[in-house]
């Protein structure tokens, strides 16, 4: 999982990318391509 300061470019990498909020953190999940996973934060 990549940790990024901004997820805007990550969100547009694939059409299956979804933005989810879990426990106060923002995640990008992709069930089709799991290597697209990312979390926002430093």
From Swiss-Prot:
NCBIfam families: PRK00831.1, rpmJ_bact. It comes from Wolbachia sp. subsp. Drosophila simulans (strain wRi). The keyword Hydrolase does not apply. PANTHER family: 50S RIBOSOMAL PROTEIN L36 2, LARGE RIBOSOMAL SUBUNIT PROTEIN BL36B. This is Large ribosomal subunit protein bL36. Belongs to the bacterial ribosomal protein bL36 family. HAMAP family: Ribosomal_bL36 (MF_00251). GO terms for cellular component: ribonucleoprotein complex; ribosome. Signal peptide: none annotated. GO terms for biological process: translation. GO terms for molecular function: structural constituent of ribosome. It comes from the Bacteria. Pfam families: Ribosomal_L36 (PF00444). Keywords: Ribonucleoprotein, Ribosomal protein.
């Amino acid at each position: 999982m990549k940790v990024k300061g901004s997820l805007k470019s990550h969100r547009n990498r694939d059409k299956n990318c979804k933005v989810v909020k879990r426990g106060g953190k923002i995640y990008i999940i992709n069930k089709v391509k799991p290597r697209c996973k990312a979390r926002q934060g430093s």
